[in-house]
């Protein structure tokens, strides 16, 4: 057995020096964000209260490649431990008795255990450069909050995190990790903001959602007196841009492996890990030089791609953000308390929404129990316990491998294992105990419009 064929590593000299920006390659322009009061496109300068100038410029840039600053590139290597490995899941292939080759890019080797550090370091750097003293953000499962807390510690920027209340209770060690890095962490809804107090008055046991936590973080920044900026973990173009370091590395690793993926898979909440892994490959599909299928996977409890409406909607629950054209369930949708906290969001990235509209990306949804079953199988075969979010991609990869077996086809399947689940074991405990519940909405708020 040639074990060298099952792990593909790059040297630190091969860590990408530029990010890939998909905007100039999309089949149509992304509809602009709108001012909800006027219905007119938002002037990018109006976002200056929330974001530093460099990130606003990246949000609308038409440059295909944007250089990674030297300080961020160094942090990717010395702090985030890039490059991350591309691994072949040979033991899973054997367990499935499939002719398919299954590969996964493993982002769980980063210090905070997920892909989120890739944009956290970039955002902390650009804010530090502009003299920002404090970053305020939301987090679902705590992966993003952990990453920004670590990045803040690295670049010397204070961090405040509003963590979705159900995850705050389900995943206490994520809070511990964030506080170890020096962050302030509050359960959302909280008593720190007007919007949070309003929701708690209505329901003292409110489980919260990413949309609510975003609202609280933005309200916090607006009332900060100018010494704080908002930091977002997904959805916006500059966030997805920073994540393309994943796919750009994977391109080189697949060349080393001597194969090219027929199917690429990623889990989707807002879209950053899916985009980071697939966008560098999607550019070839858009140019007609590739026929790779791209599968975006979401929970049936939060089915924005499979049951949502492609329309303008707020990015947060309180309606503080500009209106974004995206696949959405409606910003008032109350996402059930599933364990994949990072996927509990009502919309998806505008760039991903365009790709869904044009059929470049396929969408698929699963119940959480079948996702945990797939993650259990993967853990026993490969030794890695996937984050509940990443486990959605594992489930789709297994399904595609079984389909290949049944049809007698050899296909190359690749997915992004965006994080480990070692701080998400409560969900696995409930799965093993048989108490894990499935959720699926009967009605979608956005469909009532």
Swiss-Prot record:
Entry-linked InterPro entries: Trp_synth_b-like (IPR006316), Trp_synth_b_CS (IPR006653), Trp_synth_beta (IPR006654), Trp_synth_beta/beta-like (IPR023026), TrpB-like_PALP (IPR001926), TrpB-like_PALP_sf (IPR036052)
Alphabetically ordered keywords of this record: Amino-acid biosynthesis, Aromatic amino acid biosynthesis, Lyase, Pyridoxal phosphate, Tryptophan biosynthesis
This protein's record includes keyword Amino-acid biosynthesis: yes
Top-rank taxon: Archaea
GO cellular component assignments: cytoplasm
Catalysed reactions listed for this entry: (1S,2R)-1-C-(indol-3-yl)glycerol 3-phosphate + L-serine = D-glyceraldehyde 3-phosphate + L-tryptophan + H2O
Family that this chain belongs to: Belongs to the TrpB family.
Pfam families: PALP
Any one Gene Ontology molecular-function term assigned to this protein's record: pyridoxal phosphate binding
Cofactors named for this entry: pyridoxal 5'-phosphate
Top enzyme category: lyase
Gene3D superfamilies to which the protein is assigned, alphabetical: 3.40.50.1100
Described function: The beta subunit is responsible for the synthesis of L-tryptophan from indole and L-serine.
Pathway per the UniProt entry: Amino-acid biosynthesis; L-tryptophan biosynthesis; L-tryptophan from chorismate: step 5/5
Protein known as: Tryptophan synthase beta chain 2
N6-(pyridoxal phosphate)lysine modification, residue list: 116
This enzyme's EC code(s): 4.2.1.20
SUBUNIT field: Tetramer of two alpha and two beta chains.
